[in-house]
């Protein structure tokens, strides 16, 4: 069961990255208890409507230059860390 949960968290992270136009479009990422806050190079690449097609994503909030992804608090830490890992891999 643990492996299935891990795979699900990875899929959520990959879904978020895809909906934000790919890892190259993500400039910065931050989080709080229920939201992953993402700053992108190009907002035109962000597919907000597609984000909520994943059951773990509750909604999105657009504020200034950031888009906040409201996510299941039980998995936010792992999803955030996976996106950070993907960003670091891209830089290498």
Swiss-Prot record:
Stretches assigned to the PTS EIIB type-1 domain: 10-92
This enzyme's EC code(s): 2.7.1.-
Family annotation (InterPro entries): Glu_permease_IIB (IPR036878), PTS_IIB_1 (IPR001996)
Example GO biological process: phosphoenolpyruvate-dependent sugar phosphotransferase system
Subcellular compartments: Cytoplasm
GO CC terms, sorted: cytoplasm
Keyword Calcium in annotation: no
Gene3D superfamilies the record matches: Glucose permease domain IIB (3.30.1360.60)
Keywords: Cytoplasm, Phosphoprotein, Phosphotransferase system, Transferase
GO MF term (any one): protein-N(PI)-phosphohistidine-sugar phosphotransferase activity
Superkingdom in the source lineage: Bacteria
Leading EC class: transferase
Domain comment (free text): The EIIB domain is phosphorylated by phospho-EIIA on a cysteinyl or histidyl residue, depending on the transported sugar. Then, it transfers the phosphoryl group to the sugar substrate concomitantly with the sugar uptake processed by the EIIC domain.
Role: The phosphoenolpyruvate-dependent sugar phosphotransferase system (PTS), a major carbohydrate active -transport system, catalyzes the phosphorylation of incoming sugar substrates concomitant with their translocation across the cell membrane.
Protein name: Putative phosphotransferase enzyme IIB component BB_0367
Native source species: Borreliella burgdorferi (strain ATCC 35210 / DSM 4680 / CIP 102532 / B31)
């Amino acid at each position: 069961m643990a492996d299935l949960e891990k795979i699900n968290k990875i899929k959520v992270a990959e879904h978020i990255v895809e909906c934000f136009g790919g890892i190259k479009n993500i400039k910065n990422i931050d989080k709080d208890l229920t939201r992953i806050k993402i700053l992108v190079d190009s907002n035109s690449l962000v597919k907000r409507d597609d984000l909520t097609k994943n059951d773990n994503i509750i909604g999105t909030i657009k504020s200034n230059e950031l888009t906040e992804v409201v996510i299941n608090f039980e998995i936010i830490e792992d999803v955030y860390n996976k996106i950070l890992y993907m960003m670091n891999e891209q830089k290498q």
